[in-house]
Regions:
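Cytoplasmic-side transmembrane-helix entry/capping segments in multi-pass membrane proteins
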Residues: 30-40, 86-100, 123-130, 151-165, ...
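Hydrophobic core of alpha-helical transmembrane segments in multi-pass integral membrane proteins
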Residues: 102-104, 126-142
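C-terminal ends of transmembrane helices
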Residues: 16-29, 74-89, 139-151, 200-210
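Structural signature of hydrophobic alpha-helical transmembrane segments
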Residues: 1-14, 36, 56-74, 121-134, ...
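C-terminal transmembrane helix-loop-helix hairpin of multi-pass membrane proteins
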Residues: 4, 164, 175-191, 195-223
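A generic, lipid-embedded transmembrane alpha helix
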Residues: 36-52, 103-106
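Membrane-interface helix-loop-helix junctions at boundaries between adjacent transmembrane segments
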Residues: 55-67, 74-127
Length: 223
């Protein structure tokens, strides 16, 4: 049962990750960015976790997902502002965004565990995270940014690599859920594999304007 849940969840995530780049490429940053955040990766991850977790553990895993998406929004803010403000290259922006995600995610993971251990309701905690995510997404998209369509196709090998990265992240999340690490599995299920590979693939194929134009709508769509 565990292996089946992992494989199905990972396969769905990999397929969606591949389609996201194509959506942004075809429809432009605004429409494609929102399409990229349709919850077709967290749904199979949630189904996989539900099938192998207790009710309490599943609630704990899901309660941290809005916080994880908020961390992803901050991750995307790095991609919007770091290249212009600090003149970072694609490599530098990638490293900085991952460091920011790891640092904030780690602090939030510890805080989430302690807050809910003290008796704070999982649903209320999740709704608090959702509220913060919506505010952050609105703030990031309040000022319109250029969101051009792509003019060059992303190479098939890049699509395969990004689909594989997303599949691995979701597979690990479901596996950790089976080991009774609900908070860790919930956070890992939101690891920005799709966002990261979208940014890298589109930057390489189209230049930095296309992925930066998509980042804001991705943040708001994640809510």
């Amino acid at each position: 049962m565990l292996q089946t849940s992992i494989l199905v969840s990972a396969l769905f995530a990999g397929i969606v990750a591949t389609l996201v780049t194509i959506a942004i490429e075809r429809f432009g940053g605004r429409t494609g960015g929102v399409l990229a955040t349709i919850p077709t990766t967290i749904v199979p991850a949630a189904l996989g976790m539900y099938s192998i977790s207790s009710e309490t553990e599943f609630a704990q895993s899901m309660s941290i997902v809005p916080f994880g998406m908020m961390v992803n929004a901050i991750f995307l803010l790095v991609w919007i502002h770091a290249p212009q403000r600090w003149g970072l290259s694609l490599f530098g922006t990638t490293i900085l965004s991952l460091l920011v995600w790891t640092a904030i995610g780690s602090v939030g993971l510890v805080a989430s565990s302690q807050i809910q251990s003290s008796g704070f309701d999982a649903f209320t905690y999740a709704m608090s995270g959702l509220g913060l995510l919506i505010v952050l997404g609105l703030w990031a998209t309040w000022t319109s940014r250029p969101a051009p369509k792509g003019h060059r196709s992303v190479r098939p090998m890049v699509l395969i690599l990004r689909g594989s990265a997303a599949a691995i992240a979701i597979g690990i999340a479901v596996w950790l859920s089976g080991l009774s690490y609900p908070f860790i599995s919930g956070l890992i299920s939101t690891f920005p594999a799709i966002f990261l590979t979208s940014m890298i693939a589109l930057w390489l194929a189209q230049g930095q304007d296309v992925p930066q134009g998509a980042a804001g709508p991705m943040m708001l769509g994640g809510a």
